[in-house]
């Protein structure tokens, strides 16, 4: 299986590069933000045609069962900083881009493989806002208490 991995920052790249031989895992830095990650994913697909792409990085956490340096993998994903309003579609919810899924499900095969390593599965919320205060964290948790 050809695996691609995208990280946002140099420090993440430096931590992961020694763990994976270049002939086994393609690791590239996208820069911070979801648009940069999406662009990097498209370029990685064009150039290397990986079987899967893993987005990896440092993140905060909300669960009492999560400790510093735990590995958390998504069972599902959504945005914490998207709200399109209800003007066009009454069924759109916070975190959903209109016309797209409320949440994106992880690949079941990859999720099971990750769980075998001890990684903790759960909802991951992402966005283009660095959560640097307790108030912002409380706001996110109010929308996604299970995250």
Task: Outline where the language-model segments fall.
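Glycine-rich phosphate- or other oxyanion-binding loops that anchor nucleotides, phosphorylated ligands
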Residues: 2-3, 7, 14, 18-147
